[in-house]
Amino acid sequence: MSLEIQSKAVVVDDDLVYLQTVGLMLKKLGFQDIKLFSNPIDALSYIETIQIDLIVSDWDMPLMTGCEFLEKIRKNPKTNSVPFILNTGNRSEAYWRQAITAGVTEFLFKPFSYSVFKDSVFIAIDLARYDRRHHNSISKLAC
């Protein structure tokens, strides 16, 4: 199964091997426009200029953690509903609890397989679509 729409994704990781690997996996899934960033500061600047369909980010990065990046994404009305997959090699329960509190859509532990990544991408996109439909339904009821 692959995406059949012009899907845009942003990938952020200071580990260039993971950055390239995740980019290739997204391409295989059908994403048409994939932008790779080695730090979240540059990614935030880019995200301000375009509508995107998915963000995949590492947690442990210099300048700003992936969770801090997620918090900034969720605070921005333009990006607060974008599916966000956060990944880390740290298996601390505190990490995933903090990510859930910040509004993560999916959480992956490194290393992960293509199959696990693929499932996470489709789950994240489906959850975001459901949330948007649910929000729109509630908005219509309120009118």
Language model: regions and residue ranges:
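Two-component/phosphorelay signaling modules centered on CheY-like receiver
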Residues: L16-K35
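Alpha4 helix (beta4-alpha4-beta5 surface) of REC/receiver domains from two-component response regulators
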Residues: G23, E68, R91-E106
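Acidic, metal-coordinating helix/loop segments flanking the phosphotransfer/catalytic sites
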Residues: L36-L54
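Acidic catalytic/metal-coordinating carboxylates
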Residues: S38-N39, T65-E71
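Receiver (REC) domain active-site loop signature in two-component systems and cognate sites
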Residues: M61
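C-terminal output helix
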Residues: A94, F112-V121
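CheY-like receiver
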Residues: D126-C143
